[in-house]
Amino acid sequence: MLILLGYLVVIGTVFGGYVMTGGHLGALYQPAELVIIGGAGIGAFIVGNNGKAIKGTMKAIPLLFRRSKYTKSMYMDLLALLYRLMAKSRQQGMFSLERDIENPKESEIFASYPRILADAVMLDFIVDYLRLIISGNMNTFEIEALMDEEIETHESEAEVPANSLAMVGDSLPAFGIVAAVMGVVHALASADRPAAELGALIAHAMVGTFLGILLAYGFISPLATVLRQKSAETTKMMQCVKITLLSNLNGYAPPIAVEFGRKTLYSSERPSFIELEEHVRAVRNPNQQQTTEEA
């Protein structure tokens, strides 16, 4: 929604300001310039990326127009889930989690948090490392190094669509110049025409430079920034899981471990200490929480 609002602001201010100076919008309508700039940009995108990158970019574009699912309440659910898993392992032993991690969809603990279940990346990250911890064949430092490696791989993969769009955005001003030069060449080839017609041809040629810059910095490049922001949110969730599980492995009690995880979150979504404490207390005493809700 914000993207569409931003586009409207760009269009309204740029073209509105042009009209205020006495310009005619019809002079800016040059389909041939759009074909040159857009076609060259798409071609450069295809040339500069392999099939996997192109597919990933196409898959990422619809995500731009969806609201972020990583809200404060989802972070609370994540920390509550981790708390319940760690508390169960403390009370019943690590092997008590085997059924939960082998089939999370049938686990009573995981089923209480459908948003985590629906996030395949996050679910796999949690389950895979709990499985490694249960195996007992790796120490804390090895697990931390493996987590860092996976998070780094995730970041690299998430950067591909953003970099692809950024490359297209960076190329559009140059393709606008190409379109403008071609228009100037056409105008110079028509030098025998009256001055009024020649001036119109040169004006049409200059539209190419205008469109290239506008499309690049007003429409395409901002999308790359949004993609990076969205991928950073997923990375932050993974870092939260990492810090929480490692804290538990280092001997901290589950309430302290989730506090470690809370401190890694962005301030805009981070619950306060009191909020998290009350949420954890509700998880400890579900019957009390249900009675309160019914009252």
Curated annotation (Swiss-Prot):
Cell compartment(s), UniProt: Cell inner membrane
GO cellular component: plasma membrane
Disulfide bonds: none
TM helices/strands, residue ranges: 2-21, 34-51, 171-191, 201-222
UniProt topological domain (Cytoplasmic) ranges: 52-170, 223-295
Topological domain ranges for the Periplasmic compartment: 22-33, 192-200
Pfam families: MotA_ExbB, MotA_N
Keyword Cell membrane: yes
Membrane topology: Multi-pass membrane protein
Coiled coil: none
Main location: membrane
Keywords annotated in UniProt: Cell inner membrane, Cell membrane, Chemotaxis, Flagellar rotation, Hydrogen ion transport, Ion transport, Membrane, Transmembrane, Transmembrane helix, Transport
Family per similarity comment: Belongs to the MotA family.
Protein name: Motility protein A
